C-alpha cells in the first residue's frame, strides 16, 4: 500500500476529526483528484513541441495526458480555433497518492529558493493550485534529453468545504506552507 494513502487513513483522518469535531465520517475532507496542466505556447509555431510536452507529462504522472486545444481564435497570438496548445492529466486514487508523495518528498525540495506555499493559493472552497516553473525537478525527467524548460500548473481538488479544512488536510501530507 502507498505510504501517503496509509498516512491519510491512519493519522490524518483522526487529526481532522479532533480538530474540526465532525459528526459524520463522510464530512472528513479527502483529496479527490490532482490535475496537472502544461500549457505549451511554443506549439503555435512548432506542432512537434506538443509531443515532447506529452512525453514529459507522461513520465511525471505515470499516465497518458489529454491534449488540449484552443477554444477560439485569437489573432494577436496567431492562435486558431482547434490548435493544440497544451496537455493535462487527471490523477485519482493510487496514482494520485503516488504523485503527491513524489511531489512532497522528491520534487519540492529540488526547487530553487523554495520556502513553501502561500495560503492565498486556495480558491475559497478548499482546493489548492500552484505552479512549478520547470519540469526537471522531477527525477523521471532526464536533464540531457529535454529540449526546453516547461512549467506546469498543479491543482489539488479536495472535498473540504473551507480553505481552513483544506489547509489542515494538505498540511497533514507535509505540504509546506508559510504565513
Curated annotation (Swiss-Prot):
Under the heading Pfam families, the entry gives: Ribosomal_L5, Ribosomal_L5_C
**Any one Gene Ontology BP term:** translation
| UniProt record similarity statement | Belongs to the universal ribosomal protein uL5 family.
One GO CC term of this entry?
A: ribosome
Q: What is this protein called?
A: Large ribosomal subunit protein uL5
User: Gene behind this chain?
Assistant: rplE
What keywords are annotated for this sequence in UniProt?
Answer: Ribonucleoprotein, Ribosomal protein, RNA-binding, rRNA-binding, tRNA-binding
Q: Does the record carry Ribonucleoprotein as a key word?
A: yes
Name the PANTHER family on file: 60S RIBOSOMAL PROTEIN L11-RELATED
Protein role: This is one of the proteins that bind and probably mediate the attachment of the 5S RNA into the large ribosomal subunit, where it forms part of the central protuberance. In the 70S ribosome it contacts protein S13 of the 30S subunit (bridge B1b), connecting the 2 subunits; this bridge is implicated in subunit movement. Contacts the P site tRNA; the 5S rRNA and some of its associated proteins might help stabilize positioning of ribosome-bound tRNAs.
Q: Which GO terms describe its molecular function?
A: rRNA binding; structural constituent of ribosome; tRNA binding
Q: What is annotated about its quaternary structure and interactions?
A: Part of the 50S ribosomal subunit; part of the 5S rRNA/L5/L18/L25 subcomplex. Contacts the 5S rRNA and the P site tRNA. Forms a bridge to the 30S subunit in the 70S ribosome.
Q: Which organism is it from?
A: Rickettsia bellii (strain OSU 85-389)
